[in-house]
Amino acid sequence: MASLNENQKFWARVTELARQSIGKQAYDFFIEPAQLMSVEQDTANILLDSGMKKDYWKKQSDLITTAGFEVFGRMIDYELYANDELTDIELRRLNNQSPVDEPLSVAKPTSPLVSGLNEKYNFENFVQGPGNRWTLAAAIAVADKPGDTYNPLFIYGGAGLGKTHLMHAIGNQILTDNPTARIKYVSSENFVNDYVNATRKNQMESFENTYRNLDLLLLDDVQFFSDKEGTKNEFFNTFNALYDKGSQIVLTSDRIPQELNNLEDRLVSRFSWGLTTDITAPDYETRMAILLIKSESSHLEFPSETLSYIAGQIDSNVRELEGALNRVEFVARANGISIVDIETASQALRSLKNATQQSLSNLTIKKIQDEVANYYHISFSDLVGPKRPKEIAFPRQIAMYLVRELLGTSLPAIGTAFGGRDHTTVMYAYKQISDKMKNDMDVQKDIDSIKRKF
């Protein structure tokens, strides 16, 4: 076993090499939280804060090899462990050694080149939460090693959840690390327009030079891609040209690739070559964090209870949350209010609440039941019937939760609508789903997807 002093030197060298070879965002997310627990029999035991980061670390063997030869004078292998996967025995064994921590240096991003990027979107001002944590991790990994880690990166989710923010953040970070990088951000609609204009003006060579020689292509909202064969063929060829030369491709959509009915199977399959990851609606804590950050620049005072009230009123997406805060600010300034209380916020958001209520005015228990049954591929009779296997009981709880949440129906009335069940059963179902919504991303995603149907 290596001495503690040698271990410290070894880990210090690993982190130093990492800082020299990867971007700050990737270092902060993947390297900084990692801990060297011990070096035993020429194997470094490294503890990660999440098993999701193992794939990234498996590609960092050069760091370990180089540091091993420099400090120990021999080849050092490494074993990866994760806090969320460890057994008690492994944890006790690994904790016999103290981790080594290294401080980080902070690098300021530079201004982007003319490439369609918006410099205000970066990783630093992207608020992380349960609904976007792993997508953020993937974006950071892509920005650190474009064309290598996840290519293409396909991000999907509802409107206003931060997909475009992450696209620009990837581009801005890559441009910071490599100011000569050729980067283009473009919506699918503008890609189509560029192609149509090029064909009309007989400028296809210029079009191909623009798109096929990029280091990074950021294509937003691919669900709006044209049905025209010429456009799809051109993008297919552009995708292949970029992929073959190792350029990074990032795509966003409001749905998974397999649901993009306007695109050919050959394109859809390519979209799935890398990593497909989603963003769901922000939970309460994330909404509060967003409001705290945004309110700091308003020059008005927002007590925490006021922000909590706003966060409780808007649970759909970040864009609507920011819009609600802007509306509250406007009403406060118009009335000469410098300390924004709940009454002011309530007054400002009243019209928004009325609009939401209007959109749900035609919603019924039966419509919710039908939508949930359809989403989980079960029959209506099973949803409200006596069967209790998990594949039926869970959708039933989801449906009860949504009826209570969206319609405010009484517990006994909900029980009656679900086959005459007791109100305590409904109460239990509502609590179960409410608890899962706090930390289960799959449940959050299901609820968000079903809500969007309404």
UniProtKB/Swiss-Prot annotation:
Ranges where the record places region Domain III, AAA+ region: 116-332
One of the protein's GO biological processes: regulation of DNA replication
Region (Domain I, interacts with DnaA modulators): 1-77
Top-level division of the source organism's lineage: Bacteria
Signal peptide positions (record): none
Localization, UniProt: Cytoplasm
Presence of keyword Cytoplasm: yes
Keywords, ordered alphabetically: ATP-binding, Cytoplasm, DNA replication, DNA-binding, Lipid-binding, Nucleotide-binding
Family matches, as PROSITE patterns: DNAA
Renumbered residue ranges of the record's region Domain II: 77-115
Gene Ontology molecular-function annotations: ATP binding; ATP hydrolysis activity; DNA replication origin binding; lipid binding
Keyword field contains DNA-binding: yes
Entry's Gene Ontology cellular component terms: cytoplasm; plasma membrane
Region feature (Domain IV, binds dsDNA): 333-454
Residues bound to ATP: G160, G162, K163, T164
HAMAP family to which the protein is assigned, alphabetical: DnaA_bact
Function according to Swiss-Prot or TrEMBL: Plays an essential role in the initiation and regulation of chromosomal replication. ATP-DnaA binds to the origin of replication (oriC) to initiate formation of the DNA replication initiation complex once per cell cycle. Binds the DnaA box (a 9 base pair repeat at the origin) and separates the double-stranded (ds)DNA. Forms a right-handed helical filament on oriC DNA; dsDNA binds to the exterior of the filament while single-stranded (ss)DNA is stabiized in the filament's interior.
Domain topic, free-text comment: Domain I is involved in oligomerization and binding regulators, domain II is flexibile and of varying length in different bacteria, domain III forms the AAA+ region, while domain IV binds dsDNA.
Subunit structure: Oligomerizes as a right-handed, spiral filament on DNA at oriC.
Family: Belongs to the DnaA family.
Protein name, UniProt field: Chromosomal replication initiator protein DnaA
Lineage: Bacteria, Bacillati, Bacillota, Bacilli, Lactobacillales
Gene name for this UniProt entry: dnaA
